[in-house]
Amino acid sequence: MMRSHYCGQLNESLDGQEITLCGWVHRRRDHGGVIFLDIRDREGLAQVVFDPDRAETFAKADRVRSEYVVKITGKVRLRPAGAVNPNMASGAIEVLGYELDVLNEAETPPFPLNEYTDVGEETRLRYRFIDLRRPEMAEKLKLRSRITSSIRRYLDDNGFLDVETPILTRATPEGARDYLVPSRTHAGSFFALPQSPQLFKQLLMVAGFDRYYQIAKCFRDEDLRADRQPEFTQIDIETSFLDEKDIMDITETMVRNLFKEVLGVEFGELPHMPLAEAMRRFGSDKPDLRIPLELVDVEDQLKDVEFKVFAGPANDPKCRVTALRVPGGASMPRKQIDDYTKFVGIYGAKGLAYIKVNERAAGVDGLQSPIVKNIPLDNINVILDRVGAVDGDIVFFGADKAKIVSEALGALRIKLGHDLNLLTCEWAPLWVVDFPMFEENDDGSLTAMHHPFTSPKCTPEDLEANPAAALSRAYDMVLNGTELGGGSIRIHDKAMQQTVFRVLGISEDEQQEKFGFLLDALKYGAPPHGGLAFGLDRLVMLMTGASSIREVIAFPKTQSAACVMTQAPGVVDAKSLRELHIRLREQAKAE
């Protein structure tokens, strides 16, 4: 091997030993005839000193520049008193350089690596191979590796088998657009890249592999956000002969073990919260329990008021009127309230009513708001009591369709929590349970809330008679307002699976065309089974404190689903298109 140690491994115990380092020149300094090189590798930094006594080596050190690749042999020694660098893991020692070999020179990088600089993300992605040299980026990928190793160890120790499933498969309706791959040997036909290994892992259960896992690549052609990529990694788990409680216990223990092993963080037992409660109290199916603010329904106090903005929704069963108390918010300036009004508008809210509670004992005179003159004081007092308002608070109101109010005030709750530094703890995990089987589209049709293979809590007859009332055997693990993973008990009975397909409007012909292989499998002794999948990228993002999953993926795509480094996607030559039986239509020319 060319090196004897990594830079980050050097410490006082190696004092007096000869070692060899390989890495990049992170920083070069010349002080009073002595040259200092900070050498960097994936494990950290080490300071190497060259003095003029070794003239040939000193001359080489004088010629090297930042990002040269070097091999250095020297002796470890303790730094002089007062020269210890507490910001470096190896800051108590340095290496007196004897030999220096330049393994490769380097041009000046497009951005500096040895200090924080405000470099645009596109530039960083264009030169990702340089961006990843930065210690903070290397630390994220190293932590990602520790996370996957911990998960694999836990699952292996608990009897799970790591089984690969196909990447080239066929399109199935899973909620997002598929990435399609044309077949050269089957003209006019296409493979689809998997959005998840869902059906294959269920088939593995039918085959008798009762504990399966896979660190799986998945693909979705969807609009991108901070927590989305066209290709992403999933910790995929499936089991047979276990119920919801068993699966949740196994995966919860896995996550608790992971956080303790990797971050030294210990969780207690995760609370369980029904979806209806999460939406009612927090306006979200993935509530952030670190924020001590809650939505409180107040329709009953506003049904008969003259203020139609409140009275209309208060009397409509499809609407919601909700209050959100912010402690100490009465001092909030009007501009800040206006900014929050614009913010909730993003979610469809038409406005943001409020009451500033200056002095409750003074009655209406102690309340500051354009709306108090339209609501009887007795009703206002009931509302203020219900939300727990005291002098110095502000209470915001939302009144509209239930979905709009929940989304708008739920998002406002999160924003207020961060803007006003209200977070009460660093980590707040929970399980969200009791999801509906279906959700209604604007046209009145139904779609599966999770996917069409989720088992309901009722019989096929009850499901078909009243599908909107059916609850599923699904569960999501949520951490700090982010969905870490979701899963369910699956349907293992053919009649139940066909009932779900019928409720979703999938004809028998379409069932056979798209899911015939699954329906066939369910005829041959499918066991009760269920599972869960965690988003690895999201998990690493949370554990590293990164602002985007792009920060924890080695070579991510941009928000327009492109790779600026390789220039993918790219144009394909005419010969390749002919072999794939594809002809491109000419784009209309802009006038």
From Swiss-Prot:
EC nos: 6.1.1.23
UniProt-listed SUPFAM superfamilies: Class II aaRS and biotin synthetases (SSF55681), GAD domain-like (SSF55261), Nucleic acid-binding proteins (SSF50249)
Record GO terms (molecular function): aspartate-tRNA ligase activity; aspartate-tRNA(Asn) ligase activity; ATP binding; nucleic acid binding
Residue ranges, annotated region (Aspartate): 198-201
Binding site for ATP: R220, D221, E222, Q229, E483, G535, L536, D537, R538
Chemical reaction(s) catalysed: tRNA(Asx) + L-aspartate + ATP = L-aspartyl-tRNA(Asx) + AMP + diphosphate
GO CC annotation: cytoplasm
KW ATP-binding (keyword) present: yes
Alphabetized Pfam families for the sequence: GAD, tRNA-synt_2, tRNA_anti-codon
Main localization (coarse): cytoplasm
Record-linked InterPro entries: Aa-tRNA-synt_II, aa-tRNA-synth_II, aa-tRNA-synth_II/BPL/LPL, Asp-tRNA-ligase_1, Asp-tRNA-ligase_1_N, Asp/Asn-tRNA-synth_IIb, AspRS_core, GAD-like_sf
Keywords on record: Aminoacyl-tRNA synthetase, ATP-binding, Cytoplasm, Ligase, Nucleotide-binding, Protein biosynthesis
CDD domains membership: AspRS_core (cd00777), EcAspRS_like_N (cd04317)
Top-level EC class: ligase
Protein localization: Cytoplasm
Family: Belongs to the class-II aminoacyl-tRNA synthetase family. Type 1 subfamily.
Function: Aspartyl-tRNA synthetase with relaxed tRNA specificity since it is able to aspartylate not only its cognate tRNA(Asp) but also tRNA(Asn). Reaction proceeds in two steps: L-aspartate is first activated by ATP to form Asp-AMP and then transferred to the acceptor end of tRNA(Asp/Asn).
Self-association state and partner proteins as the record states: Homodimer.
Name of the featured protein: Aspartate--tRNA(Asp/Asn) ligase
The species this protein was found in: Ectopseudomonas mendocina (strain ymp) (Pseudomonas mendocina)
